[in-house]
């Protein structure tokens, strides 16, 4: 079976209870791949990481195996992880703690990042993207052909 790759951006809105409607193009894959089970946690750049449960388990195991000097990062990734399920209306509840950590209020952007997603506040994402673009290409992409 080919590796599942999530890609693309979806502009979405959180409802008053902090729920996010999963885009239709991802629902079937997430249902088949993870039975609608996801894990959300903090990302160091100020967004949230959203993993289908099988991808989370691999990530979690890598983080748990980090040396003691990375204990703080273990706390950030594992200590803030929340298991959620896609409900019958195709929504996911983002906890108040994680919404606050990522500055999520209403308008959000869900970005497919391969095996997982990033969930951003729209304005925070636009500022982050502008900053990245202003920095230019990193040296590691010097030989990359577009």
UniProtKB/Swiss-Prot annotation:
GO biological process: negative regulation of DNA-templated transcription initiation
SUPFAM superfamilies named in the record: AbrB/MazE/MraZ-like
Family matches, as Pfam families: MraZ (PF02381)
Positions of the SpoVT-AbrB domain: 9-55, 81-124
UniProtKB keywords: Cytoplasm, DNA-binding, Repeat, Transcription, Transcription regulation
Cellular component aspect of the GO annotation: cytoplasm; nucleoid
InterPro entries: MraZ (IPR003444), MraZ_C (IPR035644), MraZ_dom (IPR020603), MraZ_N (IPR035642), MraZ_sf (IPR038619), SpoVT-AbrB_dom (IPR007159), SpoVT-AbrB_sf (IPR037914)
Molecular function GO labels: DNA-binding transcription factor activity; transcription cis-regulatory region binding
DNA-binding keyword on record: yes
Compartments where found: Cytoplasm, Nucleoid
UniProt signal peptide: none
Complex formation: Forms oligomers.
HAMAP family in alphabetical order: MraZ
Xref: PANTHER family: TRANSCRIPTIONAL REGULATOR MRAZ
Record family assignment: Belongs to the MraZ family.
Protein name: Transcriptional regulator MraZ
Naturally occurring in which organism (per UniProt): Methylibium petroleiphilum (strain ATCC BAA-1232 / LMG 22953 / PM1)
């Amino acid at each position: 079976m080919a590796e599942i790759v999530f890609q693309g951006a979806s502009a979405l809105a959180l409802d008053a209870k902090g729920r996010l409607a999963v885009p239709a193009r991802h629902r079937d894959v997430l249902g088949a791949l993870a039975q609608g089970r996801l894990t959300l946690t903090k990302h160091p750049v100020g967004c949230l990481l959203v993993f289908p449960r099988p991808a989370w388990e691999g990530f979690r195991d890598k983080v748990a195996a980090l040396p003691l000097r990375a204990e703080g990062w273990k706390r950030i990734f594992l200590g803030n992880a929340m298991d959620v399920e896609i409900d019958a209306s195709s929504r996911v509840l983002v906890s108040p703690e994680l919404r606050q950590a990522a500055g999520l209020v209403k308008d959000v952007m869900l970005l497919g990042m391969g095996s997982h997603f990033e969930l951003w506040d729209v304005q925070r994402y636009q500022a982050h993207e502008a900053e990245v673009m202003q920095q230019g290409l990193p040296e590691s992409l010097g030989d990359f052909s577009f």
